[in-house]
Amino acid sequence: MIKKQYDLMVLDKEDFPVIFVRVIRVDRFTDERRIFYFQQAHEYAKRLNADYVLVVSPFQMELWDSHTEKPVAMFDTATAFEPYSERWGTAEKLSRHGLESLTHLWLDRIIFWPNDDEVPYKEKLRKLGVVEKLKYGIVRRKPEE
């Protein structure tokens, strides 16, 4: 069971009929704990018909496909979400699934982020055009003019 001190954010699907991304904040990832949290996240994702699971810790962020239960991308949160490629091979390979690619592909979709104004990646997201910080820590990409 996921403890209350971890954030789980959901929007009403009627209000936002778009892709759902689950957020879970954990203090650290050990393989055992990581697997446990992903299993729990995927259970919630299936119940909510979520497409992706996003797991955030102070050191890294991982985005998983809820349907295949396979990783899509990983970012090093300590460096403001610069692609973290040690586990995922070359930077070129990762860049296809990098934050820039994700935000450009999901023009009309919502991505959930931790509701914390002090984290360094907020400005990076704004520079990428991912602005419009909404309630519950959600940010949405600006529509193309």
Residue ranges and their predicted role:
Residues 1-52, 62-145:
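A short, conserved, highly charged catalytic patch centered on acidic carboxylates
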Residues 53-57:
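A structural signal for short, well-ordered beta-strand segments and their strand-loop junctions
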